[in-house]
Swiss-Prot record:
The keyword Metal-binding does not apply. The lineage of its organism: Archaea, Methanobacteriati, Methanobacteriota, Stenosarchaea group, Methanomicrobia. Keywords: Amino-acid biosynthesis, Aromatic amino acid biosynthesis, Lyase, Schiff base. 3-dehydroquinate binds at E39, V40, R41, R73, R203, Q228. This is 3-dehydroquinate dehydratase. Pfam families: DHquinase_I. Pathway: Metabolic intermediate biosynthesis; chorismate biosynthesis; chorismate from D-erythrose 4-phosphate and phosphoenolpyruvate: step 3/7. It comes from Methanosarcina acetivorans (strain ATCC 35395 / DSM 2834 / JCM 12185 / C2A). Its EC number is 4.2.1.10.
Amino acid sequence: MTQIGPFDLEKKAAVVAVILEKPLETSKKAAEKGADILEVRLDLLGIRNPESAAKIIREIKSETGLPVLVTNRSVAEGGKWEGKEVDRTELLVALLSLKDGPDAVDIELSASREDRDKVIKAAKAHGKTVIISSHDFSKTPSPQEMTATLAEMFLAEADIAKIAVMPGSMEDVLNLLKVTLEFKNTGKTVCTIAMGKPGKHTRVVAPLYGSVLTYASIESNAVAAPGQLPVDEVKKIMEMLK
């Protein structure tokens, strides 16, 4: 069984609201709009201190009752972390050891093996869910490359393997969905996203093919990645497609 906090991803896909500003205020708003999980983006919030991050996560969980996924995205993968790579991953390690800390962590496949393994080890030691991710903002790799990337994530001990790609055509989108379905049929837990305008519909359609997480914005004018839709709209459409 794959869970983030108490949310069972084998029963249904989760709508993840991305918290990128005014963390407590937007988290409450996301909960009101129907979010299942909150992703706290430390890099976008400009949080570099473990104590500050822990306090915010604690308050968010207390106020909303929702599970929290913590992410501290590197610049290379579309994030805004400024500073040493070791400090970026050590911040995640520190938070994962807390009893009332995050329920899950997202670490990039592109992180150094040493730093990535420290984050994964800390998460596993404290019963937290591990998402290993890869983001390509320029293209959609071939089906073989996407399959190999997801497989590498599972070898690295991902609970959830996540890829986000930029399609140049609807064929690219179909290839991503086909790869998603293939992993679902082998019992693997994946999250797949096609970004930008051609991939916008995958935000609500990919779960039908086996993607267990779909990322959404709280406001339509504040998105963390191209093509994100508002939480309440995603929830509504997903309910209609059930």
